[in-house]
Amino acid sequence: MTILLQQKTEILQFMKERNFIYRFLAKSLFLPPTQEIFKFYIENRHLVLSILPETDNGLKFLEQGLLDMAQYRAEKWQALEKEHERLFFNSGPVPVYPWESVYTGEHILYDAHTLAVKSEYRKWQLDIEDPTQGPLDHIGLECSFMAVLTERAMKDLAEDKEDGFVENIKAQQHFLQAHIAGFAGLFCEKLRKAAACDFYRGLGFFLEFWIKSDLQNLTELLALLLKDKSREIKFPLRKQVLPESFLAADTFYIGLKHSAETGKQMKIVPTAGRNNCGGCCVVKAHVQDGNILKVTTDSEPDAPESPQVRACVRAYGYRRTFLSPDRLKYPMKRVGERGEGKFVRISWDEALDLLALETKRIKKCYGAASRYVNYAWGYSGAVQAMRLAKRLLALDGGYLDFYNSYSSACTSYATPYTYGTKFTGNTPDDYVHSKLIILWGHNPAETIFGTNTTYYLKKAKESGTKIIVVDPRYSMTAAALADEWIPVRPTTDNALMDAMAYTIFTENLHDQKFLDTFCLGFDASHMPVGIDGKESYCAYLLGEKDGIAKTPAWAAKITGVPEIKIQQLARDYALMKPAALIQGYGPQRHAYGEQPVRGGTVLAAMTGNVGIAGGCASGAGATDRHGVLSVPTGENPFPGRIPCYLWTEAVAAGEKMSATEHGLEGVTNLDSGIKMLWNMSGQCLLNQHGDINKTMEILKDTTKCEFIVCSDIFMTPSAKFADLLLPGTTVFEEDNMRSPWGSGDYICSMSQVIEPPFACRPEYEWMKDVAERLGIREAFTEGHESMADWCAALYHKMQQAHPELPAYEKFRQRGIFKWAHTEPQIAFAAQIADFAKNPFPTPSGKIEIFSPRLYALNKPEEIPAVPKYIRAWEGPEDALREKYPLQMIGWHYARRCHSVHDNNEAMEEAFRQEMWMNPQDAAARNIVNGDRAEVFNDRGKMQIFVKVTPRIMPGVISVPQGAWFSPDGKGIDQRGSINVLTSLKATPLAKGNAQHTNLVDVKKIQCEEGGA
């Protein structure tokens, strides 16, 4: 092949033109606009515009934009730079995603499409210059890549390297066709709609035209070069000669650098599920050259003594969640009203200087106890952000701490009043020994509650165990495993338990010997000295004080469970021994949620199902067989603690909090309310807290809490209330390790898979820098400079107690260590085997059915000494039902772990956010399946799709908790965020969240109201 001189000159002009345009596009799309960058293009705008056909309707926008730039002053350039950042580089969702993979792949970053682009760069020894700018399939970088190729093509042409020139043109055509042309149209359409200035609007027209035109011209050029006689060549003649200054003034790579690094082979990196679901599943990331192509799960041999630790739907969705283009990307500080969501991007140095300054200022002005680390479990691990923040503040003089949790406040707090400990559960491998399992408000098929919980329930069912589910909702667990479903009205669980106990006692089905030997306060003859026998549990059942016997007929009216069903349930539980009554966390997240917790323990004691294989002591049900050590928080110099659910009270009126009314511990009063709040990777700042509207009102008052710092990976509803917002990392971008909740027989390594994108940093990394500014870095790190260092140190400490653990590197390589147990762990087996040597860890040494400690509180109406049914506020017997006739509960949806994954589009396709409503209630409101409805009470309004189904009992609606609060202009939530309607009122003893106790009404949304 020989290129004629005339052709060569013409082609060279063509290459110059293309090089100029691609550099113009690369700069316009990738670099923040400055006068220095655009001066050349402003002066030569006629050459840029001459490339567009005169009929192109984007010409006037681009021309006007460049003309305007010629008149810009400093403030106008600043405004244009902000517009560029808003469009393409905002720290969070952007109007116009600039990355190819978002359009052509799974709407995520760092996938196979990103890898394909990187492979193209590698062929030409190029790589991204600054990884903090994000993935290299940015359209601006792809235009820069085309500019580099044209420059090299010109060099080949000038040196008569015709073969190299042709190969280069082929590569350009391929890259245009395979990559840029595939998404430029969609990108440009979004740019035209989103742009607020003529320049970027015109760029949206120009780019789309240019890519189509250039692809056609390259195709014609290749036909000319290859002398394709089968087609008519229409390679365009160049009508003007471009000056040499086009190249001389502009010869650097834009966003790219030379790199001799070659492509990398795919590898599988072991990590694990880090959701706070109680599970800890094996996740294997298949990664190549910094791009995660897929995830798989445990593939080791499956055995009964060591089953596989398989991932659920949430873990399989990690890529779609954590590689989202909506990630927070850079540190930001608030510039609008708190909660408005308006931020400006700042550097890490500025962010950490500000944080250190506020930490010092607030301590000096209000004392160390005015600083608070909010309850936050956006992820679990040995190195966990909330605990790290506590460690940092403990070393800096202290902080106001909390106790309890949002998950299990009542059960963790109340169970020890009966047993002296919350560790009352048998491990799940014991389920197979049960003849009957009652899952009371327990739905592990969706909540997970330990990765293999449903595996062991399935094994029990296969061995003949009868499974009964007690729940207002026919859950996924009930559908998959239950032999029987017993729906019960929310907040009435104790009435059902009381009637069961009444039946068991009056029909002489109870284990009197067990009660006589191990229990305190069941009947008058086993009461503490000096306490009237009418205070016993038996006296309560028989109505000796209140005149009401707790019969099945009495309970049927309250609970909605037929009398005969109550009797049969009681008989089954008493006679099908060993039986396990396993409580979930839903029933205890109600008004008086402490009562069903202790009610379940009484039933277990009455039937002698405590401390035996196949039984269950009920209550909290925690186990402590194995676990991973965590980075210690250290000793807090300030002794005060509040219940975690009452932090809003501590912000609004902390000085008025007391021990009796608010559960304040460690101190008699607080000198100040919360003035500084650290919210590290969690949504209890707003979305997961009760009464969102009231919480927003408290947070918006900057005279109360003066500074809020949040670390997160998305612009969540909670993150919008930050004064300083820091971009965190995901499971793929850091080292950690963890175990499931205490029932787990394994620990998992969580190895870093890819580098953190953009300017994202693990909390530990930036907290070290804050510690440096506070003068406590050495004490904070203890010589551990990374999360990996901490994991290694903690693992080596674990090896001292567990010498069977393999070498640390082997553990990291395999990703998991499993203990193989031949026998289950049975809570209180030692007490039952030898009570004299092993009393229960209560003050009396017995199971305290009657609690002297609760009796001493002298609050029998709300905190009785024996568990009993108490009419709940906003319960079925509340007069408020005249106004709001429906009870509303929440549940943990299979698609989310609390609020994590709500922004996962694939999950939304599989599990739409919708409330469940019984056909009777729907018909009364003219609602049919699929309608949108408004749910409302005095606290707020939300709109949501309706699933009409008999799987929820009449009089009750159920809303999946965790949806992200998304208000419209009137403040009406459009996403179905349940906490718009829940209350800040806490339970009387534990001061726990009663977020499942709500009265509401529902109305169908008519078309004119904006419904779908």
Language-model features and meaning:
Residues V241-L509, M680, G969-A1012:
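N-terminal export/assembly segments and adjacent metallocofactor-ligating motifs
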Residues A272, D471, E697, T703-F707, ...:
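Phosphate/diphosphate-binding loops
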Residues P428, F732-P756, W766-M767, A771:
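Glycine/threonine-rich phosphate-binding loop and adjacent beta-strand/alpha-helix elements that clamp
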Residues A389-L457, S463-T465, V469-V470, A495, ...:
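Extended redox/cofactor-interaction regions of prokaryotic respiratory oxidoreductases
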Residues S525, V529-E655:
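Active-site phosphate/pyrophosphate-binding segments
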Residues G464, I468, R473-M576:
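Long, well-ordered, tryptophan-enriched scaffold segments
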Residues M1-S245:
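Surface/interface-facing alpha-helical segments and adjacent flexible terminal/loop regions used
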